[in-house]
């Protein structure tokens, strides 16, 4: 809230209580994040104008473990990785995923609250970089 107190029913407040329960039992929760998202060859505005029908993905076939396909998205993925590293979020890897245009980024594990914060930041960075690249 505006007094810097936790809101008891917020996701952050709930997570803090769960972490405290773990600590009281002698455990430490460590978490990692694997985020998957799609890259499109159209802007958000263009996709919206088409009523979100048939957006043009950056890839055209299954990308999972296809090292040649991911070179097409590498400028965007490199920018995402570099920006995350620059703000202190350690990226372990990124790769193309199953669906056309689907990407994955994995970050190193850390404590639960830090990972929750990082997860939100990673999503924001990925959206903004993708928006910049169109």
State where each predicted segment sits.
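Glycine-rich, acidic/polar active-site loops that bind/position phosphate-bearing ligands
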Residues: 1-134
């Amino acid at each position: 809230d505006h007094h810097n107190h936790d809101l008891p029913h917020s996701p952050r407040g709930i997570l803090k209580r769960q972490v405290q329960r773990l600590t009281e039992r002698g455990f430490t929760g460590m978490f990692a994040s694997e985020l998957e998202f799609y890259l499109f060859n159209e802007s958000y505005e263009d996709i919206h104008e088409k009523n979100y029908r048939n957006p043009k993905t950056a890839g055209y076939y299954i990308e999972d473990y296809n090292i040649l396909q991911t070179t097409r998205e590498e400028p965007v993925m490199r920018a995402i990785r570099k920006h995350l590293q620059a703000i202190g979020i350690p990226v372990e890897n990124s790769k193309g995923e199953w669906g056309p245009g689907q990407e994955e980024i994995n970050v190193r594990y850390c404590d639960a609250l830090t990972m929750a914060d990082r997860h939100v930041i990673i999503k924001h960075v990925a959206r903004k970089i993708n928006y910049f690249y169109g």
